[in-house]
Amino acid sequence: MSKWIIPDIHGCPRTLQTLLENLLKISKNDELFFLGDYIDRGPGGKEVIDYIMELQANGYHVHCLKGNHEDYCLQSWEADNKPHLFKPKVQKSWEAVGAGTTLKSFGVKRPRDIPQPYINWMKDLKYYIELEHYILVHAGLNFHIKDPFADTHSMIWTRSFKVDFSKTDGRRIIHGHIPVDYSFIDLVIHNPAGYDFIALDNGVFVTDKPGMGNLMAFNPDDNTLIAQSNLDM
């Protein structure tokens, strides 16, 4: 049985499917951990969720975390379902980071028209997962407070943190959220003494920069790192 941790997919279903089926060759004995941001930027947000839902329905061991882009979507959906004269601020913020491609993938023009099953799926996403040697989270944890696991906002939105190992039982943080170069991902994986985190997001949608534009998969048991280049954009 293998464990695979996969960060921000951002609406790239062909890339995800090729990574899982052709490179990882997943089986129902494996465990898959997704770090959030399934939607936006790429053209197939709905298709990404459909594919993951299909894996879940077919008995694969799938664990899904919430990302800030799902939070954008949920907040926009809730705001759009309330009476208003002007477009809600959160909806404008979401549009600035790729809402248009997600709405188009659902065949709708407004957040409130996204089908309820997808909204329910996003609402049910976890904020973090604890493994023996790692804590998985979309963005990071707030170590400035006594209990970093109480701050769910930081889990999907923070952009910087310094791990307090006394609050993680000595475990490193594995996260996505902020795109980093492939060489940096490889560096932090193999230098636990120098880095208290492993950043896995290679910016799958950043296809115009060297060292970027891959969807990553990381095996925390043997430090294997697999990259699939973008096939959707």
Question: Model-predicted segments: where are they?
Answer:
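Short, glycine/acidic-enriched loop or turn micro-motifs at the edges of active sites
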Residues: H10-G11, D40, D71, L141, ...
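Short, basic/aromatic-enriched C-terminal tail that caps enzymatic domains
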Residues: N214-M233
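Residue-level marker for buried hydrophobic side chains located in beta-strands
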Residues: I5, L32-F34, C64-L65, I135, ...
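Glycine-rich phosphate-binding loop signature in dinucleotide/nucleotide-binding domains
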Residues: K25-K28, N58, I129-L131
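Active-site glycine-centered loops adjacent to acidic/histidine catalytic or metal-binding residues
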Residues: D8, D37, G67-N68, H177, ...
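Active-site neighborhood of divalent metal-dependent phosphoester bond hydrolases
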Residues: R41-K126, K162-V163
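N-terminal active-site segment of His-dependent metallophosphoesterases
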Residues: M1-Y51
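Acidic, His/Gly-enriched loop-helix segments that form or flank divalent-metal centers
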Residues: S93-G213, L231
